[in-house]
Amino acid sequence: MHRYRSHTCGALRESDIDSNVRLSGWCHRIRDHGGLLFIDLRDHYGITQCVVDPDSKAFRLAETLRSEWVVKFDGRVRRRPDGTDNPELPTGAVEVFINEIEVLGEAAELPMPVFGDQEYPEEIRLKYRFLDLRRDRLHQNIMTRGKIIDSMRARMKEVGFFEFQTPILTASSPEGARDFLVPSRIHPGKFYALPQAPQQYKQLLMMSGFDRYFQIAPCFRDEDPRADRLPGEFYQLDLEMSFVTQEDVFAAMEPVITGVFEDFADGKPVTKNWPRIPFAEALRKYGTDKPDLRNPLIMQDVSEHFRGSGFKVFARMLEQEGNEVWAIPGPAGGSRAFCDRMNSWAQGEGQPGLGYIMWREGGEGAGPLANNIGPERTAAIRDQLGLKEGDAAFFVAGDPQKFWKFAGLARTKLGEELNLIDKDRFELAWIVDFPMYEYNEDEKKVDFSHNPFSMPQGGLEALQTQDPLTIKAFQYDIACNGYEIASGGIRNHKPAAMVKAFEIAGYGEETVIERFGGMYRAFQYGAPPHGGMAAGVDRIVMLLCGTNNLREISLFPMNQRAEDLLMGAPSDVTTQQLRELHIRLNLPQN
């Protein structure tokens, strides 16, 4: 028999009754039932109930066992007594009668129990992550993560992609987020950077004659903490294709992502033919470029009903060019209490309030706005939004560029409060036609809106002749249930167009050569049309595991202060290490 086990703790069945077995694992739970000791033994594969009676030579040692001790049991498999089966366990029809015990590893007093689903402070969970990872929910999430990545790899290879590994030590790129810098010992005063993404390398692969590349790529960004992003590092399914249009990328990747979701959706419906929503339409209808399409609410422009109306606040606003009034329908939200609650919520979000109209019995509009604009305009709004008695509408007004984010939050809040969001499905969509440029209010200049390497729609001619703020890019995202899970684009592969694109954003050719010299050089030697995308592995896993916390699907995450509480990172280093790197510390004064 094997030194440690003949079976795993998830393997024994009724067919094993009367077999002599050896199991090893952790003492998950210990119960004393009238002299009989019941020990649930756990390993990676499952749990087996083991029993020791007072007449067993192993009983005295069994009494000393504590939770999370690592032990080896020798015993005999028997049928559980009638009425004691546990249908929730694959091993629930049998138990092991122990006749010999060996303690393989004792455990100190636990700072948090492994048994059960009780919540514990994040600091404790991260400091003792090795215990947290033994808990079933987190353990299963990590296993699901591995299986999802396996599915991604298999599906990518099925459609002709090859996996390559791009460098981890690379050159710093000042645009975008801050780099994590790595000092060079051999080249004093110079630094490598950890890649924010393999963007330039994957484009260089296409220029090197490869056709379809992918990798599960680690990416590093020294960003301030955000609720929807882990500090430090994240992983993406990164890919690039040569000689493709935007349609080719969609045709290749939509089945891959759909298939991965279907593999792990646990029977929940997954969108088959993804809608394509232009960026501008997404903002107007949903107030976000990553809409949750499970929420049926669609915003509409109702400016015409307030222009010249008795509600002077909106009427005066609409006298200024560019201002609009948007309505968010609230089906079954037509009670004073609910409308007042939404108004209070808006004030809590830093807004002056949230105007509303309620439609009561007989279809009459009610509320301050209805009283000011009159029944005819109120009825016209109701008809435009397709509402009825018992419903409500909520209004935001002003410059859409300034209020669309809040409008999107209000739409989401209404969907949640009115229980309109079907949590048991995955709604995927392409968001297309992103603007190439936006106006940077802080720096008072035109800047890139998204990826600076994207091809402008209309190519070089558009860059030379159009108002930059009207140029759209061959840039696209994938949205799922309110999250951006992928982003990509067709690349600007012509040197003249690349230089012009950066020139519009205020960067001269010398800056392009300085920052992106390797790729710019490669463009001079025959660059194929190419494009691709990167899908966020962590967010996809998070959605499929049914959680909204990225730490619940990551092995050893940092806390929100970018600290690894288990390993003690970041840490001090020795004077000798700093001397070898020619670095002297100049720390801020407290």
UniProtKB/Swiss-Prot annotation:
GO terms for molecular function: aspartate-tRNA ligase activity; aspartate-tRNA(Asn) ligase activity; ATP binding; nucleic acid binding. It holds the Pfam family tRNA_anti-codon. The keyword ATP-binding applies. L-aspartate binds at residues 175, 221, 450, 491. ATP binds at residues 221-223, 484, 536-539. Residues 199-202 are annotated as: Aspartate. It is found in: Cytoplasm. Its EC number is 6.1.1.23. Disulfide bonds: none annotated. Coiled coil: none annotated. The record marks 33, 83 as: Important for tRNA non-discrimination. One of its GO terms (cellular component) is cytoplasm. It catalyses: tRNA(Asx) + L-aspartate + ATP = L-aspartyl-tRNA(Asx) + AMP + diphosphate. Keywords: Aminoacyl-tRNA synthetase, ATP-binding, Cytoplasm, Ligase, Nucleotide-binding, Protein biosynthesis. Gene3D superfamilies: Bira Bifunctional Protein, Domain 2, GAD-like domain, Nucleic acid-binding proteins. The keyword Transferase does not apply. One of its GO terms (biological process) is aspartyl-tRNA aminoacylation. InterPro entries: Aa-tRNA-synt_II, aa-tRNA-synth_II, aa-tRNA-synth_II/BPL/LPL, Asp-tRNA-ligase_1, Asp-tRNA-ligase_1_N, Asp/Asn-tRNA-synth_IIb, AspRS_core, GAD-like_sf. Its main location: cytoplasm. It is an enzyme of class 6 (ligase). Aspartyl-tRNA synthetase with relaxed tRNA specificity since it is able to aspartylate not only its cognate tRNA(Asp) but also tRNA(Asn). Reaction proceeds in two steps: L-aspartate is first activated by ATP to form Asp-AMP and then transferred to the acceptor end of tRNA(Asp/Asn). Belongs to the class-II aminoacyl-tRNA synthetase family. Type 1 subfamily. PANTHER family: ASPARTATE--TRNA LIGASE, MITOCHONDRIAL (PTHR22594:SF5), ASPARTYL/LYSYL-TRNA SYNTHETASE (PTHR22594). This is Aspartate--tRNA(Asp/Asn) ligase. It comes from Afipia carboxidovorans (strain ATCC 49405 / DSM 1227 / KCTC 32145 / OM5).
